[in-house]
Each structure stands twice: as C-alpha cells, then as structure tokens.
Regions:
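Membrane-interfacial loop-to-transmembrane alpha-helix junctions, especially the N-terminal start
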Residues: 62-72, 129-134, 197-206, 374-386
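Membrane-embedded catalytic interface detector for glycan/lipid assembly enzymes
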Residues: 109-243, 255-275, 327-329
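Hydrophobic alpha-helical segments
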Residues: 336-345, 349-426
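Transmembrane alpha-helical segments
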Residues: 106, 181-188, 234-235, 239, ...
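Small-residue-enriched transmembrane helix-hairpin modules in multi-pass membrane proteins
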Residues: 160-164, 249, 256-368
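Hydrophobic alpha-helical transmembrane segments
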Residues: 206-207, 227, 249, 357-358, ...
C-alpha cells in the first residue's frame, strides 16, 4: 500500500511542479504575490476589526472550545426540525430519539477508548504531497467547469432553467474543488505553523481559495458545494488560529443569510413563489417539505427497512435511479427530480429504526475519532480531513450523505482513522 501511495504522490508532485514552472502559472503566482503584499501592507487592512473584536464571545466556554465539536451536527439537525411548519409524527419522534442517542454514543463515549496510546505512531503526511494533490484537484475541477458550461450553452446562474440540463458525469468532477481547497488550505496552515508565512498571508490565501470556489460554484447555481467551501475554510481557519471566534460567528450568520437568499432568488427565478413571499417563509416551507418526506420515509422503512442497502448503493454511478430520485419514487411523487431525504432518510429506508441507531452511531464515531485525532496531534492534515467530513455531515442534515464523491471522502477518512487506531493500540 505504501508503494502505491508513494508512486501516486510522486507522479502528482511532478505534475504540480510542471504546472508551477509553466509561464502561465508563474505569471499568476507572481501577480498573486504582489496582491498579497499589497493586502498585508494595506491601510484599509488596519481598519478591519482586531482579533479581540466582540471579545465577550471568547468568554463563552462552549463557543470557544466546542463550536465545531461533532455534536454540532445534532444541534443543526434540531434547528432544522424546528424550522418546519408542522410537527413530526409519533413514529418519527422515536426514530429521531434513536438517531440522536446513537450519534451521541458514537461521538462522545466510544472515542474515549481509542487513540490513547503513543501518538508518535500516528500516520504523518507530507505537506508537499497534500498541496500537490489539492492543487491538481482544483485544476481538474476548473477544466470540468468550462466543459459543463459549454455542454449546456450558458451559465446556470444567469439562466436557472438550464441548471437541470447539467450532466452529473461532468459536474461531479467540478465538486473536486472542495477537497482540493481543503488540502491546499491545510498546506497553508502547515506553512503558518512552521512560520514560513505570517498569519496575514495565511488569511489572504484562505480568502483567495474561498473566492475561487465562490466564482466557479456560484456560476453553476449550486448552493450546497458553495456552503461546503465556506464551512471548510472557517473550520480549518478556526482550529489553525487563522480565523477568530467572532469571525466564525459572523460567518455563520452570513452563511445562514446566503442559504435564505440563494434559495429565495432561485425560487423566484423558477416561479415557485412570488416576490411578496417572505424569505424566511421560503426557508420554513423547504424545511417543512423535507420533514414531510422524512415522515413518509419513516413510515415506509418501519423498524427494519425495505430496501436493505439498495438506496445507498444507488449512489454508485451507472445506477438506474440516484438515491434522491429513488426517494421521489418511494413516496410516489416525482421520479424525474431529486428529493432530499435528510441525514437519516436513507438509513431508515434501508434498515429502519434499528439501522438509524447503528448508522448514526457509526457516523458519530467517525466524527468523534476525527475530532480526537485532530485535538491530540494539532496536525494540519487531520485538521483538514476533519473539516471535510464535518462539513458534509452538517450539510447532510438536509441533503443526506448520498453523493458518491462524499462517500469516498468518508471512506478515505475511515481507512486512515482505522490504521491509526490499530497502530496506537499496538
């Protein structure tokens, strides 16, 4: 396995080096270096609030130390349920209690019994390897962005109707910009910790990465990947001491505003609501519809499920129906569009209430181990990978964790965490 990894990283490093040596990228990085210096020495930068702005937030123990604890997934899930206009059914209430209990046991209790050995045995990853992989992923995503736009003959943000013409086989590689950003940001975090760049330089590079993500993902008209990029930068920056607590709180408010705003204007463009409708009501109605879907899925799934893994397996490319289209078919609604089933929708349909308890426990354990590993090592890579899986767990509260590339991210994280568990136990 180490031979395969070494061969792949060596090849990717060579590709990355060749691109960096090219005239185009030499010019780009020279210009960016100039802009970075202007930013650091800018007069306007001094007008920006200091790290101690809204200092009362730092006195809150939960915000300062546990804001991105894995339990935030349960908090977000609870808020999402409260947004709905109607209440949950009695059966779904039991399912939710099992889900919350399983997740809590998985993330808060079970990790205490692991990774208590010698931390020197924990796997270490080279900064250059992670940067090169991230850089190449971003390049691939940019190439497929232009291919996707050309395939539909326009920019989906400007023509919302053509967004549904986008082909998943072309847009899926575009979303590689998310893990690419995660790895490159983690590499910059390593540079900052090694004092190779200043905090101001690290902050500028984080902002630039976020700007690139916003530019490409927003033009495609996708909201969830855009929020993923935003969350990843915030989480890595917070645990790397690059982003202050008050910026996290303000960023969260901006993120909520973006969710409401993008959803509202998209609905206006698609004529599903009028301009007289409240943006808050638009968010509530979306949450209410998703909760209604979950109520139906819970009724269908029962105690032991009906599809027994077929919904999760439908995430694999080439399946007749994707998992969210399968949801539409199961609830006898519309099979030609995707329907979001929430974080536990797939679990309850595949394996029922029993499956929800077990799968939420597994998800909680993955996040709990990732959180513990990040805290013990303070390592740039483990900070990045935790940010990646926590981000998609939070966003999965509405959408579910059903996209094949996201499942691959979790599979990689599980593989790395298991190796570390075995190494530290021995």
């Amino acid at each position: 396995m180490s031979v395969i990894y070494s061969t792949l990283t060596s090849l990717i490093n060579k590709i990355s080096d060749e691109f960096h040596k090219s005239f185009l990228f030499t010019a780009i990085f020279t210009i960016l270096g100039f802009i970075e210096n202007q930013w650091i020495n800018s007069f306007f930068k001094k007008l920006y609030p200091s790290e101690n702005f809204l200092n009362f937030l730092n006195k809150n123990h939960i915000l300062k130390n546990h804001i991105f604890n894995p339990l935030i997934v349960l908090f977000v899930f609870a808020v999402f349920l409260l947004l709905a206009l109607n209440s949950v059914s009695g059966s779904l209430a039991i399912t939710l209690m099992l889900a919350f209990a399983g997740f809590f046991i998985g993330c808060a209790i079970l990790p205490r019994y692991f990774l208590n050995g010698n931390t020197e045995k924990i796997l270490q990853f080279k900064r250059k390897d992670m940067y090169s992989i991230g850089f190449c992923l971003i390049l691939v995503s940019i190439v497929f962005f232009f291919i996707s736009v050309a395939s539909v003959g326009g920019i989906p943000l400007l023509k919302p109707s053509i967004r549904y013409l986008l082909k998943p086989i072309l847009t899926m590689p575009v979303f590689l910009i998310i893990p690419g950003t995660c790895l490159v940001a983690s590499a910059y975090l390593k540079d900052y910790h090694d004092r190779e760049i200043t905090r101001s330089q690290a902050r500028f590079r984080f902002l630039f990465l976020l700007a690139i993500d916003c530019a490409f993902l927003l033009l495609l008209g996708y909201r969830t990947p855009l929020l993923a990029a935003f969350l990843i930068i915030i989480i890595i920056g917070f645990y790397g001491n690059i982003v202050s607590l008050w910026e996290v709180v303000v960023g969260a408010l901006i993120g909520v505003g973006a969710i409401i705003g993008i959803g509202y204007f998209r609905s206006l463009g698609e004529l599903t609501m009028t301009s007289s409708t409240s943006p808050i009501y638009a968010l509530q109605s979306r949450a209410d519809f998703t909760l209604h879907v979950l109520n139906l899925l819970d009724f269908i799934g029962g105690n032991f499920g009906v599809t027994h893994g077929h919904m999760l397996a439908s995430s694999i490319p080439g399946s007749d129906l994707g998992p969210r289209m399968m949801v539409g078919k199961l609830i006898a609604w519309r099979t030609e569009v995707t329907v979001t089933p929430t974080l536990i929708g797939q679990m309850v349909v595949d394996f029922g209430k029993v499956g929800v308890f077990i799968e939420m426990g597994i998800l909680g354990f993955i996040l709990g181990i990732g959180f513990k590993l990040m805290q013990k090592t303070k390592n740039f890579f483990y900070t990045g990978i935790y940010a990646l899986i926590l981000t998609y767990s939070i966003l999965g509260v509405e959408t579910g964790i059903l996209d094949i590339q996201v499942l691959v991210y979790f599979a990689i994280a599980i593989f790395i965490y298991l190796i570390n568990i075995v190494r530290t136990r021995n």
